[in-house]
A protein has these predicted regions:
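N-terminal pre-Walker A segment at the start of P-loop NTPase domains
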Residues: 9-24
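Phosphate-binding P-loop
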Residues: 26-34
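Hydrophobic anchor at the beta1->P-loop junction of P-loop NTPases
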Residues: 39
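Conserved substrate/cofactor phosphate-moiety recognition/catalytic segment
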Residues: 45, 52-114, 133-135
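Well-ordered, non-membrane alpha-helical segments in soluble/globular domains
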Residues: 99-109, 137-147, 184-196, 223-227
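Loop/turn-to-beta-strand initiation segments
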Residues: 117-121, 155-157
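A glycine- and Lys/Arg-enriched "phosphate-lid" helix/loop adjacent to the NTP-binding pocket
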Residues: 140-141, 148-200
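NTP-dependent small-molecule kinase module
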Residues: 196-245
Length: 245
């Protein structure tokens, strides 16, 4: 097959320019960002907004020219029942098939991270929330010690999102403008109690924990605080990379 000659421009053949090869990237010399962050907190603490913000923040997942599907998972997903606001890995019915399924979900997600450790993982509520709910709703104590050992081996960090006293009412008013299930915000004392319980349970965890006051809602500043903390702990990068540097 013959090549089509270049078009004539002003009576002269058009000049074919050689493609310029881009300069070799220096990214290969920079440690890969592989943070693994569990966001815990009661409702109205902006944890889900923060999860999405962290999952796109350049200091957490690296600079990007376009949106990318970094993993973001949540134990709040109510996938055990065929209706909205049903049950899932946090609020399962204890002592039977649902509890076994919930524990299998936690095990499966941790195994997934173990199989792909050199990547970022953002988790919106996980095992600490399950402990809190089961204690509150059923006086049922869950033992996640083995799970936490695996999470610690993966260098998973916990960010406990909290809200200052005196701001719950305003936060509820803001949420009710968009909520599809407003009755869940009737009892603000429940959220206050759950926040204290989550504080206690996070204090019992063997994982690194940062308590983060999210009241003011400046997501970029909050992401910066998380990035500063994880940079100080070394949790942003693979341990092999930080130990070799």
């Amino acid at each position: 097959m013959h090549e089509v000659p270049p078009r004539l421009l002003g009576g002269r053949p058009a000049v074919r320019r050689r493609a310029v090869r881009p300069a070799r990237s220096t990214l290969a010399t920079v440690p890969k960002l592989t943070p693994k962050i569990i966001l815990e907190g009661t409702r109205l603490t902006r944890k889900t907004d923060l999860a999405f913000a962290l999952n796109e923040h350049p200091r957490i997942v690296g600079p990007r020219r376009y949106r990318y599907h970094s993993p973001l998972i949540s134990a709040e997903w109510c996938g055990f029942t065929p209706h909205p606001w049903g049950r899932g890995p946090i609020n399962f019915e204890p002592g039977g098939e649902e509890e076994a399924r919930a524990l299998a979900v936690f095990d499966t997600w941790v195994r997934l991270i173990e199989l792909q450790p050199h990547y970022s993982w953002i988790i919106d509520r996980f095992h600490i929330s399950a402990r809190a709910h089961q204690l509150t709703a059923h006086e049922h104590a869950l033992d996640f010690r083995t799970l936490e050992e695996r999470l610690r081996a993966l260098d998973v960090h916990v960010v406990l999102c909290t809200r200052r006293d005196g701001t719950w009412e305003a936060a509820r008013d803001e949420r009710l403008l968009i909520s599809g299930n407003p009755s869940q915000y009737d009892d603000l004392d429940f959220f206050r109690r759950e926040q204290e319980l989550l504080r206690r349970l996070a204090g019992e965890s063997i994982l690194p924990v940062l308590e983060l006051d999210t009241t003011d809602g400046d997501l970029d500043a909050l992401c910066g605080q998380v990035a500063d903390w994880m940079s100080a702990t070394g949790g942003l990068w693979p341990r092999e990379a930080t130990e070799a540097s």
